[in-house]
């Protein structure tokens, strides 16, 4: 048998040897959650039932590919309710809207379909209940996010936004006999939220915790899955849009959990090949509003660059589904 030293390997043999050590760890769960699946299907079914155009207030979910695909099918996305013509069909996005927006739509005789995620609706109901019971509400979330605007709009006079640890000291004083509770946006980093809540408790000794967790199961599951692959990954690529809160949180979680680097991309072609320089293990995940076809595109991109060994790391199984708005459910026979 003829033995060949490493420096005598042919170019193709050297490439094969290098590729043999390259691997991809794919986080699971990833991608679509039950709320996003319901919201996207709401628009699809509305187009089937009523025909184009169907108007959608804001992006139905925060994903460029999904929005563009639905627009090609006849959905028209508008920033404000008043941009939809009187009497049109209008879908409210998965992020929810305030009572003022509902009234605005009613005044325009719009035929509304509410695609708000049921887990967001749960937080809306908590705000209404605690406001009715005389509480001040500290809402942990990101200023300007549609979900936060809709949730705070349920009781704007008693809801105070907490956008980061640094904002805790900017909150007004609350007397000890004033009832005080914190709630949160559903798509936040679990670890960051707990850091903020710890600071809130330090400042307000009488602050109450909510009866149940507001950060949704899908957000938590995707963060746990990313943590499971991050420490072994030279780089973690998260598929998701820049305006997606939960996708951006996955990048942050990956870095905090030990990834060498982490990047957010909408499409595989946005990956800078320099990110892979020297990398032997690449982690891949996707936000809750990302269809699996975009993840497959990233895996194909990596495969073409020698990352042939693909292993899925599963930390939870998701079986939750949500019913469509009543007007779009199949008729009972």
From Swiss-Prot:
It catalyses: isopentenyl diphosphate + 2 oxidized [2Fe-2S]-[ferredoxin] + H2O = (2E)-4-hydroxy-3-methylbut-2-enyl diphosphate + 2 reduced [2Fe-2S]-[ferredoxin] + 2 H(+); dimethylallyl diphosphate + 2 oxidized [2Fe-2S]-[ferredoxin] + H2O = (2E)-4-hydroxy-3-methylbut-2-enyl diphosphate + 2 reduced [2Fe-2S]-[ferredoxin] + 2 H(+). The active site is at 147 (proton donor). Binds 1 [4Fe-4S] cluster per subunit. Isopentenyl diphosphate binds at residues 62, 95, 145, 244-246, 289. (2E)-4-hydroxy-3-methylbut-2-enyl diphosphate binds at residues 62, 95, 145, 186, 244-246, 289. Its EC number is 1.17.7.4. Keywords: 4Fe-4S, Iron, Iron-sulfur, Isoprene biosynthesis, Metal-binding, Oxidoreductase. [4Fe-4S] cluster binds at residues 33, 117, 216. InterPro entries: LytB/IspH (IPR003451). The keyword Oxidoreductase applies. It comes from the Bacteria. GO terms for molecular function: 4 iron, 4 sulfur cluster binding; 4-hydroxy-3-methylbut-2-enyl diphosphate reductase activity; metal ion binding. Dimethylallyl diphosphate binds at residues 62, 95, 145, 244-246, 289. Its cofactor is [4Fe-4S] cluster. One of its GO terms (biological process) is dimethylallyl diphosphate biosynthetic process. Pathway: Isoprenoid biosynthesis; dimethylallyl diphosphate biosynthesis; dimethylallyl diphosphate from (2E)-4-hydroxy-3-methylbutenyl diphosphate: step 1/1; Isoprenoid biosynthesis; isopentenyl diphosphate biosynthesis via DXP pathway; isopentenyl diphosphate from 1-deoxy-D-xylulose 5-phosphate: step 6/6. HAMAP family: IspH. Belongs to the IspH family. Catalyzes the conversion of 1-hydroxy-2-methyl-2-(E)-butenyl 4-diphosphate (HMBPP) into a mixture of isopentenyl diphosphate (IPP) and dimethylallyl diphosphate (DMAPP). Acts in the terminal step of the DOXP/MEP pathway for isoprenoid precursor biosynthesis. NCBIfam families: ispH_lytB, PRK01045.1-3, PRK01045.1-4. This is 4-hydroxy-3-methylbut-2-enyl diphosphate reductase. It comes from Corynebacterium diphtheriae (strain ATCC 700971 / NCTC 13129 / Biotype gravis). The gene is ispH.
